[in-house]
């Protein structure tokens, strides 16, 4: 799958589109998830679908259906660049090891800093108890999974 990811990423180079994920699903479905700084439009999905159809045909990639879409409002965060990009946003993280009996934290992602051992350290500002704001420091190695967790109003717009 790593080769397919690299091939897809190379095919999208220069389009201003970030490749988030490539997934093989049941019944020959190949699901490609893309993102852009200002959000994915339907035209982006169409353009990527046409581009990848040609590339996959030339490279003999076996699939029956190609699905191109956005990661959605609760997109996963997987690497340092994504964490840096979404600093200031509300996220949910699940830690590999519990801190104060908790593994799951939701709060505002803070800018990265570098620790004494040159690891990138992020902060998560969260409400431990009512009106008790704390900051959890973590590295990417500490995280099992992370995703955006925006608060949406009843009209579906991010607040």
From Swiss-Prot:
Pfam families: DUF150_C (PF17384), RimP_N (PF02576). GO terms for cellular component: cytosol. InterPro entries: Ribosome_maturation_RimP, RimP_C, RimP_C_sf, RimP_N, RimP_N_sf. Keywords: Cytoplasm, Ribosome biogenesis. Transmembrane segments: none annotated. Its main location: cytoplasm. It comes from the Bacteria. One of its GO terms (biological process) is translation. Belongs to the RimP family. Required for maturation of 30S ribosomal subunits. This is Ribosome maturation factor RimP.
